[in-house]
Amino acid sequence: MVLRADPSRLLVSEVATAVARDAVALAKTFRGPGAFARGDQLVRATLSVVSNIAEGCGRGTVPEFRRFLLIARGSAQETLAQLRLVDAPSPAQTSQLQSLRTRTVLILKMISRLYAHPPPDK
């Protein structure tokens, strides 16, 4: 079975891209010991979600697509773990963190749904 999915047409890819952009902005605000390492890990985890969804689409088969979705799901779980480690010094940052957490949970649900129901063949 050949899969011809376009990541730019998948809602999960759009949401993951927005989360990655917001994570980059958040990471720039980190201060204190280990700030760079924490920010870098958060950014790499969010970028991995987007990248693995795109790579899975490019592989061309449903089994490969699903394999990369599992990797993306693991990276989304890592993103949640990194977000739990962030201390929010301001109400604005608290709101930003909550938004990132909520959207990351949404990504996890969307990946699970997409795994169970991959895009149709073209």
Identify the meaning behind each predicted range.
Residues 1-122:
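Amphipathic alpha-helical assembly/interaction segments
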